[in-house]
Amino acid sequence: MNHLNEIKMNSEIIISVYKTSISPKDVCRLTPVLDNFTKISNWNIDLKDWENILRVESQFSVENNIIGMLNNLNIVCIELH
């Protein structure tokens, strides 16, 4: 096993879940922001949920970054615990 595979196997994925005010229109401007944030490995938005849930997967703690990025776009974002 090479060193990179060993790191990947030992890395924990942190899943953060947020209640948001994301609308379908917001998704277009939010997508490049989240896609280009290199610390995020995966993300999705459930617009069918009344809380417009944003789910983020990362190997890093990104909660403050996510909340700040969405707030800068005038989107309400509250982490759910």
Task: Label each residue range with its predicted role.
Residues 15, 51-53:
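A generic structural signal for beta-strand entry/edge sites
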Residues 19-38:
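Short amphipathic alpha-helix segments
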Residues 2-5, 35-42:
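Short amphipathic beta-strand starts and helix->beta connectors
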Residues 43-50:
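RNA-recognition motif
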Residues 19-22, 55-60:
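Short beta-strand-to-loop capping motifs
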Residues 5-22:
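Short glycine-/aliphatic-rich beta-strand segments at the starts of folded cytosolic domains
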Residues 59-81:
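C-terminal structural segments of small proteins and small subunits
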